Amino acid sequence: MKPRHASNSPFSLPVLQMLAFIAIALSTPVPAVEKTGFNSESPLRRVEYWQLRSEAINAELENRAALPAVKLVFLGDSITDFWQLGENPWVRGQQFGIDSWKLAFVEGLPENRALNMGISGDRTEHVLYRIQPKAAGGLGQLDAPELDPEFIVLMIGINNTWAQEDPVVESVFAGIVSVLNAVHARKPKARIILQSLLPTNDEVRNGDVVVPVNARIKDLAARQPHAAYTVFLDLYPLFTDSTGKQKTAFFVTDGVHPNAAGYRAWSATLLPFLRSERNP
């Protein structure tokens, strides 16, 4: 009898047969499961953030019984809007200003009860449309007679520095003047706190546009007829360091919007400013 030769394979025959079966099974195409009911098959109205935000403001304005308690109306773009947001919805881990907003303007003194009417992406022309009376074709967001604020806190114009109209300083300034005039026409008893534009992380934009616009609106607020109902609040130095550059510790990574610390600093400046305006 011839001696059996040991196999060089580490696997026994049954194991090899099983592995071969698995290999065949894996190489056999799996029939596709037919899926139905895709979103792509059905009509869907496109809804952007600004539309939802505008609807939310309109809903607050429809609550006429609550409007007499509003002493401050904040009007502007995303820099104003995001003061009442918590975590950045677009970038995880970044915080906006909800805590300081609640502390100062919701849970604070009744004289500082506020309505935030900022909408992300707004340019001066968009604010003009929102506050234009409904009878004139606008949204009428200052129409309600029950809304009778002591102050309207305004910051607008930075979005006009992108996709700008040239000459850019003149166009941004003209837009701010138009908003200022329209706000006063709608709420003539309110004092308007005209805030400076904040620095961006673009030093060229700051030097060529933001700083010159701020100088012009500061001068505007000091001259009649605007001085009778407008006061200028210069926030630019608060948000810059000793070299004049943007204080990055006060901004999220996009270099435009304040972070939680920036909003706290803004609140800590605005509240004493309001007190001084009430008690000159």
What are these regions (language model features)?
Residues P199-P280:
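Catalytic His-Asp segment of secreted/periplasmic serine-dependent ester chemistry enzymes
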Residues P14-A25:
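Bacterial N-terminal signal peptides
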Residues V153-T161, L180-V213, Y236-S242:
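Active-site segments of SGNH/GDSL-like serine hydrolases
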Residues K71-G76, R113-G118, E150-I156, N160, ...:
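Structural recognition of the beta-strand scaffold that forms the well-ordered cores
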Residues V168-S178, V209-N214:
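Charged helix-capping and loop-helix junction motifs
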Residues A32-S120, E125-L147:
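Serine-esterase "nucleophile elbow" of acetyl-processing enzymes
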Residues A114-I119, R123, G157-V172, T200-N206:
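Surface-exposed cleft-lining segments at the edges of enzyme active sites
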Residues M1-S12:
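N-terminal secretory signal peptides that target proteins for export/translocation
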